[in-house]
Amino acid sequence: MLQIPVAKVAVLAATFAFDRPYTYKIPQPLTDTLRPGCRVMVPFSRGNRPCEGMVLALDKAEDDPKLKPITRQLDPEPILSLELIRLAVWMHDRFFCTIYDALHAILPAGVWYRVSTVYCAAPELDAAAALAQCGRSKQRRLALETVLEHGGRCPLDELQAAFGDKDPASALHWLVEQKFLTVEGTQKRVVRDKQLEYASLAVPLEEAQEEIRRRRRAPHQVAILELLCTIGRASAGEVCQFTGAPRSSMKALVQQGVVHIDTEPYFRRPVHYTGQPQPIPVLTPAQEQVFDGLKELLRAPDAQAALLFGVTGSGKTLVYLHLIAQALAAGQGAILLVPEISLTPQMIEAFSAYFGDTVAVLHSGLPLSERYDEWKRIRAGLARVVVGTRSAVFAPVQDLGLLIIDEEQEDTYKSESTPRYHARDVAKFRCAQHRALLLLGSATPDVVSRYYAETGRYHYFTLPDRFNARKLPDVIIADMKQELRNGNSGSISSVLYGELEENLRRGEQSILFLNRRGASKIVTCAECGATYSCPNCSVSLTYHQGNQMLICHHCGYRRRVDPQCPVCGGELRFLGDGTERIEADLHALFPGVETLRMDADAIAMAGTHEALLQRFARERIPIMIGTQMITKGLNFENVTLVGVLNADQSLYVGDYRANERTFSLITQVIGRSGRGDAPGRAVIQTFTPANETIRQAARQDYDAFYRSEIRLRKLNGTPPFSEVLAVTVSGAQENAVVRCCAYIRDYFRQTIGERAEVLGPAPLPVVRMNNRYRYRVTLYCNQSKAVRRAAANIVMYCNTEKSFRDVTVFADDNPLD
């Protein structure tokens, strides 16, 4: 049979259960322009609804009347490379998401279209006859009447509004099949490309000078011409601003052929570096030794992976800088990932000083327009070094040679929404595709990463000492049980109070860490014990002193606090101090001493992380109180004291990673102290001072912690000695959720058998969130294709089976909670 050109297309509307590359005919006008990586509009499903799609591959196939044609090409050039297309398909298989979910993670939000579906009355439609053919079907008549009432063109959302709670899809499908209605799609870009107009002379210089003499009665036109005669070419807006001339004067000169206007792409950017790049500082002998080893891996013909363990303040960033310079010299690009948005300003400032305008920044805190334009600069090869948070791992860097993940143990590198990917896994795939070097850096490496280094899967490098032989902070463990026995029930121990007093006397700065925002975690009645709980979630409401509101940090529900208990009228007690309460306590303990609070609420008021950090550094504010965002990467030379206010908070949470998270948090925040010339100190407040993890963190002895933790993991069969695969079920009815979970558990036990330990159903730590109950079945196994296929099959089955229609099911690889 006749072979025709076809395209394999990932379709936006496809759910996970039906997601696959769909085959579409390529119309003759598109055969020369359509390529993989271009977006298209295609008819999809029974109603041929216009839908956006991405071309994954081109092929030939036998002509089949059932094949639908592509209706429109949206991109004149591919917006996605073949490597990133392969990445999207791999993510579909690896993270249990649709291909389009992966594409939405890979591409910036500004590149997407808003696609609207419009139903139109067919040309020459006999409305009366069509309504008669609708018969007794009220839905068909309503759909047709709604389209006619809108003048024969009605957007789908208007039709859905007319139908209320009912779905108009079946009625619309029938009307389209009967050729009473046609379907159209409209597209509008979320962010448009910005163009800048430039003005230049359209005539020779001598002729322009003659025009100046002839136009003495038009002073604004003369001013424009004189400026262009001097500088040759400039932004049209700046020319008008500099000369004071209105746009009408510029327009008149253009219409008369004296001035020419052309346009160039303009990049909206978060950071502009105008100075000359500085030389990178010289490495110490220890850093030089590490750099030499990593440089050899960078030059290797195949993909390589390495773990760099360096204590806080050992100068890992300087090694990164030299490695990136080496990659650039070889004509390669580089990506540096940081765990928090708060770290990007410091990194960007440092990297721009050494690499100039070739540095781009990507993170979710940027406006859509700036993210989109930074992505365009990277794709065009104008930016070869990318610094950003988790999503920057998808940056379309040309000739990627180096990908660095700083503080690689951080949970923020794992996405908790679809697609549920870990940046480290994506980085491994990309480095394999580019034959690049993946470098993981940390003062407290992930236990799994350290095990891979020990067993030879990663190369291993160490920086065991601080830069310039600076000492690690001296650490004191404060026993909060003893403080209670001594009559101190406050959040600041006598030990920490004395150290803060000493720092204030010296004019040095202090940082206090508490991973709980708000003022009080629980508000309870001293008489009857009633507590304020969220009506939508199974958690207590947190009291915020600034606005005197009780707020749920999961769903956003808020309400005013009552003057007394609403149940019995008793006195209310505020328990479980947060950052707001600590700030108030500090003002009471040290009257007149300025403090700065850095948590999500304070940042929302200040506008950006950067504004608060700059204020802390510039004004030398004596004390900063903050949540997890202050624990890593920040470098303030005048900070000589760190206080960890509740070291037990993350230690007893029933997760196999609890010890690791606690050790990492304490070690990282202690490392903010003593990074300048003055020695550092730290105070760890705990109710369990004999706990081995806390004592190891106080000694900052990662090797001892790793040895004890890996023994425990091996005994329990937890990662790295297995992998975790979780299938989560959520729904409004708890019994329906548990019933579905039980079915999934039984399915795994029958299909996988001895290859996995199957646990559950078990409630999540917050079992009800936004009025939906959440339970989980967990597998501890060595993941194989068969295990993953079984997980994908059960997710697809449960999301399409009518008996489970009231629940939502998804799978997650190594979940955080």
List where the protein language model places each region:
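Accessory, non-ATPase domains that flank or precede helicase/AAA+ motor cores in DNA-metabolism machines
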Residues: 1-442, 454-470, 780, 788-792, ...
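Inter-lobe coupling/hinge segments of SF2-like helicase ATPases
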Residues: 275-295, 301-738, 754, 765-767, ...
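A short, contiguous, amphipathic alpha-helix enriched in charged residues
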Residues: 35-36, 736-749
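C-terminal structured "cap/appendage" subdomains that terminate the fold
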Residues: 747-784, 790-794
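Short beta-strand micro-motifs in enzyme catalytic cores
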Residues: 5-7, 197, 723-725, 773-775
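Surface-exposed amphipathic alpha-helical segments in non-transmembrane regions
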Residues: 702-704, 710, 745-750, 784, ...
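Short beta-strand elements
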Residues: 182, 596, 752-764, 805-813
